[in-house]
């Protein structure tokens, strides 16, 4: 019997159901079947480059947001952040397939605005970090559930249509907002400080890595677990580097940290755009019956 979020793989005779948390590939001998369309995927291959740039982008988003809201009028800063993320996402959705520059520009835009969205609730409306963390967690779960029920899988290897990409980016926005609130919760409410909070989330992100490689955890669950954890990890270390010594930082300045991180991201994305090492491999294209 198929569950509410299951998808059928294989011919009708002898077909089996796959839950949204199950990998979208099934092994048959030495080959694999992937529920994707050749060349149409809109997300990169998950490699070490992906995780490095993702961590840098979360840190850059935190530093850039904090710098802008203090350097110019906060209302103008938020408006610029919103316009920036809308423009970046519009450009990303206009692409017919994955392009490194547009994808990571969208991630950077979400990183900046996601930080602002989380900070606005606390600074402007006085919502406690614990409450905002729970709120964004509920939003994230709701997006996951809707995505799973609509598409039958949460695998990023099936992000090959505008609707699936919309779900993907909705999750990304929610993870950035929730991760920002969670990082601030650990650093301030739990009094761990920026560096202590960063160490904590470094340990947290090691959990899905160990679970996947050593305990054979589900690939999709492990990916999204790690993806969520990268946000508070990067944000905590960005605050540690950028904030003044009086609040537990190194005092390098948010602007300088943001600029250095943006330069590092630019160099890595340029490398990927030239080498194309982050493209989905051809053998992950479908060989469906």
For the regions a language model picked out, list residue spans one by one:
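Short hydrophobic transmembrane-like helices used for membrane targeting/insertion
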Residues: 1, 7-9, 18, 26
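Polytopic alpha-helical membrane proteins, predominantly small-molecule transporters/carriers
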Residues: 21-289
């Amino acid at each position: 019997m198929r569950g509410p979020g299951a998808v059928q793989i294989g011919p009708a005779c002898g077909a089996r159901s796959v839950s949204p948390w199950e990998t979208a590939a099934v092994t048959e001998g030495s080959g694999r079947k992937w529920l994707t369309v050749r060349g149409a995927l809109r997300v990169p291959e998950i490699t070490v480059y992906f995780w490095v740039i993702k961590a840098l982008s979360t840190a850059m988003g935190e530093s850039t947001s904090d710098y802008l809201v203090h350097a110019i009028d906060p209302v103008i800063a938020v408006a610029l952040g919103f316009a920036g993320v809308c423009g970046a996402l519009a450009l990303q959705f206009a692409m017919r397939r994955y392009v490194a520059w547009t994808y990571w520009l969208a991630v950077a835009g979400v990183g900046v605005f996601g930080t602002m969205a989380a900070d606005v609730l606390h600074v402007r409306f006085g919502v406690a970090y614990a409450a905002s963390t729970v709120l964004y967690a509920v939003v994230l779960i709701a997006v996951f559930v809707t995505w799973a029920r609509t598409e039958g899988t949460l695998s990023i290897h099936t992000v090959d249509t505008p609707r699936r990409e919309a779900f993907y980016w909705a999750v990304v926005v929610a993870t950035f907002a929730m991760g920002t609130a969670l990082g601030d919760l650990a650093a301030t409410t739990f009094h761990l400080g920026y560096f202590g909070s960063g160490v904590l989330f470094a340990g947290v992100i090691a959990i899905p890595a160990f679970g996947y490689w050593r305990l054979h955890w589900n690939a999709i669950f492990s990916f999204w677990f790690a993806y969520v954890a990268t946000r508070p990890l990067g944000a905590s270390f960005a605050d540690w580097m950028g904030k003044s010594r009086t609040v537990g930082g190194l005092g390098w300045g948010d602007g300088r940290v943001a600029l250095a991180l943006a330069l590092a991201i630019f160099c890595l994305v340029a490398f990927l755009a030239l080498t194309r090492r982050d493209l989905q491999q051809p053998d992950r294209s479908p060989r469906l019956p």
